[in-house]
Amino acid sequence: MALPRDLSIGFSPQEIQFLIENEPTRIMPRITTRKTKKQLAKDPGAQWSLITCDDSTVNNMVAMNSCEVTLWLALLLKQQGKCNVVVPSWLTLQQLEKYLDFELKNPSRFSNLPWNWLVVSSLLFARCSDDFQDPVHLLRSKVQDLREVRLGKVNKGLQYLNESHLQLENLSLMEINEMRPYACGIMDKLRTIHDSSNDTT
């Protein structure tokens, strides 16, 4: 089945979220799934395990001992009240202010935010708001400020677009995906003009 043009040259927001939800995320479990030899000897029926493709972490969790699981599983456990999510170090008010300060002082460069910062911050704000030390409404505001400043830089950077490439470093997957259809369309037209001029010379 042929895809619409906007989907054939990029990802949908749902596809991007699906990809990012497979990224490792640190949690603080509230439950213990690891079974000791004593427990197994006392109760052979205790040899149950959670169904998962990779049980190295999920079936070896100890309450209040941090571990890494995929983001989607962290969100599921959080929804069930079985863990707290450890907020990434870059998603604090102090760190976001540093990123914003860098963006404002360097009009031609992007700060080295994680490639998934937009989606991760959105998911954690919506589903793990009680795990943040800083007020979530202030964090949302900083993230929005960062997004707007970086979007302005992207639009400015498009003026350097040519028929062969466009170099904008440290953009996130979502930011690249949003500009890709427009940039690809312009590059196709520039390439056509470039090829036509070469044919006439």
Curated annotation (Swiss-Prot):
Superkingdom of source: Eukaryota
Any one annotated GO CC term: GINS complex
InterPro entries: GINS_A, GINS_bundle-like_dom_sf, GINS_Psf2, PSF2_N
Family (UniProt): Belongs to the GINS2/PSF2 family.
Function recorded in the entry: The GINS complex plays an essential role in the initiation of DNA replication. Has a role in chromosome segregation.
SUPFAM superfamilies: GINS helical bundle-like, PriA/YqbF domain
CDD domains the UniProt entry points to: GINS_A_psf2 (cd11712), GINS_B_Psf2 (cd21694)
Localization: Nucleus
Gene: PSF2
Coiled-coil residue windows: none
One Pfam family hit: Sld5
Name this protein carries in UniProt: DNA replication complex GINS protein PSF2
